[in-house]
Amino acid sequence: MGERVNRGGSDESFGRRYLDALIAVVEGTRERLPEITEAGEAVAERLVAGGDLFIASVRPDFVSEGIVRSGGLMMLRAYGPDTTLSPGDTVIFGWSNTAPGQDLALLGRLRESGAFVVGIGPAPPGENSGAFLAHVDAFLESAPPLPPLPPGVVERFGGEAYPLVSLQNLALLWAFTGEMVAALTRRGRMATMYQSVLVPGARERNARYRSHRFHEAHEVPPLPAGQVGGRYLEEIGGCLRALREEAPAIERVARACAEVRGRGNQVHAFLISHFPVYQWGAPGDPKFMQRLEVMSGETPPAAELEARMRPGDLFFFLGYYRRPAKAYEAVRRAGGLIAEVIAGTDAEPDGPTPDYVIRPRWPYRDSLTPVPGYDVKILPSSGIVQAAIYWAVVGTVAETAS
């Protein structure tokens, strides 16, 4: 579990207080490992029997985090309006209590199919809670840590718990994925898993396995219950603890954003795909930044950036590995500032040097958890960590403004 996080007085920066709360909910997830393992066992049995695996939510971020993801399952597919489910299938359904009526309606449709539903989210509010959970076969509950919370965290997000709950949902999703993979190894199967496509050679490696749910041959031994999911939670907790040391950099970036806005300029944000891109405008987001067009990959839309940037504006680049040299050059031509959040590679970055830097502290190649006998690590870190940085920055801007 590591050292206890500080939940004390408000002399800590907002970034540290928010990360303390997030570390606490991730650590709380470890207490659910027996339930996670049990759910993984049930789903593994269904997959071996030929059932398909889907992921569903009324929010696009939870689904996007799960599919075609570094360290994730190749067999996992997004559930949509045209999806036909059978009783042998499994659906991972995520919610965050931001749209309970829509959640219940979608969950009802999943239940009507007869598919096995793994629910990931906080306890539903109000009198419909019992009916809601009756539609779920396995419930992996997320919730903020019990009081005392670090002071002022939820308040900076307008009272919304989403910036904490949604990221605990991801910790549960990936711990569950790890325990399901381990349960499959105890049945002689190794699921095909993605490597980050931005690692050299990964696209070719992934293409060899993409049409297979399981490896035709593998050297992965049966893995004990609790090992893979538990290791992931340890590793992602370590990433967040390391990120906590970036709190001064987070505060510098947030103050720069506040100063830019205070003089009438804009903060233009490029947020990397999968989960982080959907945090702009999510429940609790004060929308202090203007988001650039949603795109895949690591390259901001240069034409849009050229059109938007004005002297004194700030470009907030929440990226993946690499520095977008051409985008930075466009910002400099416009007389703008640059704040950079990338993991980096072994190579020296190209392009202009940014004015502000936050080191996200998640590893190059993204995935955290080794599997004995497998060629790549599994279960990613970047979605949780990069989204946490976004929330830490905008929460600090909100505190500065108050």
What kind of feature is each model-predicted range?
Residues 1, 42, 48-186, 264, ...:
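Glycine-rich phosphate-binding loops that contact phosphosugars or nucleotide phosphates
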Residues 2-31, 211-244:
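Generic N-terminal amphipathic, Lys/Arg-enriched alpha-helix
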Residues 24-25, 148, 157, 179-223, ...:
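Internal, active-site/partner-interface "lid" segment
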